[in-house]
């Protein structure tokens, strides 16, 4: 295996995980903050807000998992070799 391709694959895998974590991390922090504010304003709607928050957090986390899958594919099932 070409060492240049191996090195580029490792760097690309690191970038895939790192960059795919930035957006969902910021989004999850914003969503959680807004949910806390909403619950503070309307405590009786806590159950509905929490359910919606957990569902949206799961969708956001899926983006990070996609980045991890791409990184694992680059590391272990490298299509460029």
Swiss-Prot record:
Cysteine pairings via disulfide bonds: none
Subcellular location as annotated: Plastid, Chloroplast thylakoid membrane
Keywords: ATP synthesis, CF(0), Chloroplast, Hydrogen ion transport, Ion transport, Lipid-binding, Membrane, Plastid, Thylakoid, Transmembrane, Transmembrane helix, Transport
Coarse class of the protein's main subcellular location: plastid
UniProt site positions, description: Reversibly protonated during proton transport: 61
TM spans (from-to): 3-23, 57-77
Membrane association type: Multi-pass membrane protein
GO MF, any single term: proton-transporting ATP synthase activity, rotational mechanism
GO cellular component, one term: proton-transporting two-sector ATPase complex, proton-transporting domain
Keyword Transport: yes
Pfam family, one: ATP-synt_C
InterPro entries reported for this sequence: ATP_synth_csu_bac/chlpt, ATP_synth_F0_csu, ATP_synth_F0_csu_DDCD_BS, ATP_synth_F0_csu_sf, ATPase_proteolipid_c-like_dom, F/V-ATP_Csub_sf
Quaternary structure and partners: F-type ATPases have 2 components, F(1) - the catalytic core - and F(0) - the membrane proton channel. F(1) has five subunits: alpha(3), beta(3), gamma(1), delta(1), epsilon(1). F(0) has four main subunits: a(1), b(1), b'(1) and c(10-14). The alpha and beta chains form an alternating ring which encloses part of the gamma chain. F(1) is attached to F(0) by a central stalk formed by the gamma and epsilon chains, while a peripheral stalk is formed by the delta, b and b' chains.
Remaining remarks: In plastids the F-type ATPase is also known as CF(1)CF(0).
Protein function: F(1)F(0) ATP synthase produces ATP from ADP in the presence of a proton or sodium gradient. F-type ATPases consist of two structural domains, F(1) containing the extramembraneous catalytic core and F(0) containing the membrane proton channel, linked together by a central stalk and a peripheral stalk. During catalysis, ATP synthesis in the catalytic domain of F(1) is coupled via a rotary mechanism of the central stalk subunits to proton translocation. Key component of the F(0) channel; it plays a direct role in translocation across the membrane. A homomeric c-ring of between 10-14 subunits forms the central stalk rotor element with the F(1) delta and epsilon subunits.
PANTHER family per UniProt: ATP SYNTHASE LIPID-BINDING PROTEIN, MITOCHONDRIAL (PTHR10031), ATP SYNTHASE SUBUNIT C, CHLOROPLASTIC (PTHR10031:SF48)
Protein family (similarity comment): Belongs to the ATPase C chain family.
UniProt-recorded name of the protein: ATP synthase subunit c, chloroplastic
Protein's organism: Chara vulgaris
């Amino acid at each position: 295996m070409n060492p240049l391709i191996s090195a580029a694959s490792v760097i690309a895998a690191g970038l895939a995980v790192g960059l795919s974590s930035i957006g969902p991390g910021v989004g999850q922090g914003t969503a959680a903050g807004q949910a806390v504010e909403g619950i503070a304003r309307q405590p009786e709607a806590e159950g509905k807000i929490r359910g919606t928050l957990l569902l949206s957090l799961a969708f956001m986390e899926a983006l990070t998992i996609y980045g991890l899958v791409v990184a694992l594919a680059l590391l272990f099932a490298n299509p460029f070799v």
